[in-house]
Amino acid sequence: MLELLKSIDAFAWGPPLLILLVGTGIYLTMRLGLLQVLRLPKAFQLIFIQDKGHGDVSSFAALCTALASTVGTGNIIGVATAIKVGGPGALFWMWMAAFFGMATKYAEGLLAIKYRTKDDHGAVAGGPMHYILLGMGEKWLPLAVLFAVAGVLVALLGIGTFTQVNSITESIQNTTTISPAITALVLSVFVAIAVFGGLKSISKVSTTVVPFMALIYILGTLTVIFFNIGKIPGTIALVFTSAFSPLAAVGGFAGASVRMAIQNGVARGVFSNESGLGSAPIAAAAAKTNEPVEQGLISMTGTFIDTLIICTLTGLTILVTGVWSGDLNGVALTQSAFSTVFSHFGPALLTIFLVLFAFTTILGWNYYGERCFEFLFGVRFIWLYRVVFVLMVLLGGFIELDMVWIIADIVNALMALPNLIALLVLSPVVIVETKKYFNK
């Protein structure tokens, strides 16, 4: 079964999807005139401006909800796995995917506001399934349904539950004697309390926890890097050289081809920042704003924070400490990097980070999956989705690590495909709206 899933994963994240994913970002970057560089200062400025418009939560809360789902195990374990399998060069391709992904995320945020609607309870509803249907017309309904089905699968079987819970249980088991079953049970109880509270409950947790945990984690990685500051030039050089040339086996590292570096860097980058996946615009649609371009700019900062800052710091921490060439993998690899500076406190410190990161990711993805489920079946059966989601959180503590990440990659690909098609079809709308806004 595992070998079959690996074959499907290799096909799903083969050249066609990678080209479509990065190609969409490159195309939007060119058509928008390097907007992710030239308008980045304004984007950060907009985050803290008072919101004026229709919506359910503030733009800052919407961004934090999106970051809650992106700043998760992908930043700690995903980066470690990418480097372990694809070599240091995977970090470079993660940067490239994030840079062009910022333009993709901008387009997603813009379209989320332009084509949002309201559900049967009066709450704002938006995201790819809505901009496919409202922006592209009824004939594209099958594509909207495909996205929504994939979104539910990702939430229940991928990023939303299994990868996060598995990472939490493994990390806690590595640092304590608590069994995965007990951890998963306790976690499912806390998740149930939060998810049955709805979006505002999730946003409240996100706006409180996300900024704090991100700042503390950044300080932790900077401390490790500072103690290895002399190795930075050589590490950066290794990242660039191994991005374009095969890397031989060394120690516990099995070696990596350029294709492996690209595939793992891009796939793990998407897993972490979700640019092109179509999840972030579901949160963006709830923002209290009537200006699509401004929400697009705010959404764009999520990819910058998640990958170009947090993932980069994780990658450098693993590389400068030299643990990447050992026998460890996953969370144990990053824990080992932290322990080189923080001694036996390192694994415990990272476990705290991981639990907070993963918990908020679970909450964010519950909301995404819920909106996709609602699009398919209406608000009447949301309670059923929430019950199944909590059960999947519980089950996540019993699934093998390798299978967890492979399943997550496969369902990610299913979700990204319809969204990327929609972004390309609706790109003229994005370009017209952008020009109209900046020509005011």
Located regions from the model:
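N-terminal alpha-helical transmembrane segments of multi-pass membrane transport
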Residues: 1-73, 83-90, 101, 394, ...
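Extracellular loop-to-transmembrane helix junctions
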Residues: 9-42, 84-122, 143, 305-313, ...
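Transmembrane helix-loop junctions in multi-pass membrane proteins
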Residues: 17, 32-36, 74-79, 155-169, ...
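Membrane-interface loop-to-helix entry segments
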Residues: 20-27, 31, 35-44, 165-172, ...
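Helix-loop-helix module between adjacent transmembrane segments
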Residues: 24, 28-29, 97-122, 129, ...
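Extracellular/periplasmic helix-exit of transmembrane alpha-helices
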Residues: 29, 108-116, 120, 222-238, ...
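Flexible loop linkers connecting adjacent transmembrane helices
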Residues: 34-58, 81-83, 87-91, 95, ...
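Alpha-helical membrane segments and immediately flanking helix-loop junctions
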Residues: 53-85, 111-114, 120-135, 146-149, ...
